Amino acid sequence: MKPLTMLFTNNPLSDMSTQPVLYAYNLPDYTIFESPKEFDYYIGEPDNIYIVLGRSNNIEGAINCENVKKDGIITLKRPSGGESVILSPNMLIFSFKQKSDKIQNPVKLFKLINSKLIENFSKLGIENLYSKGISDLSIGEKKIMGSSMFTKNKTIFYH
């Protein structure tokens, strides 16, 4: 993993002795964003436990700062939306980027991607899988996958 870039808390009055350090998102999947290819992807597994905050989350409202600092969990902030997630070893992460002159509506794009995932997981024997909300996949009431995306410089990044 590349060296972490430190971000600062949104609360200038926060106590840094109990405040975990918030780093810019730099997990291995993000390296594909800079790839010269029109389309690129990453499939892998986290090498550690990470808490990843969505673009609009703030550290104070999203996590138990004292416990996160005590446990030494690395906290990252991704450039895409959505809520905070925990990543850990033995989880599958997949991401892709696509350059495009015409960026689709994100909701339509999530629906398209989720329908393709459901179709292909179904072929593998995974049943009762459906879209929940804008970007999640569930089996029954159990969420099994969440995703987010952002666009920058005519490039879509989905993870």
Task: Give residue spans per PLM region.
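Active-site loop/lid in soluble adenylation, ligation, and acyl-transfer enzymes
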Residues: M1-E66, K70, R78
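A generic local secondary-structure boundary/capping motif
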Residues: Y41, I63-C65, E83-V85, G146-N153
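Generic structural "secondary-structure junction" signal
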Residues: E45, L53-R55, K70, L87-P89, ...
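Short Gly/Ser/Thr- and Asp/Glu-enriched loop/turn motifs at secondary-structure junctions
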Residues: P46-N48, S80, P89, Y130-I134
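Short beta-strand-initiation
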Residues: E38-F39, S80, K132, I144
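A glycine-rich, hydrophobic loop/mini-helix early in the fold
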Residues: A62-K102
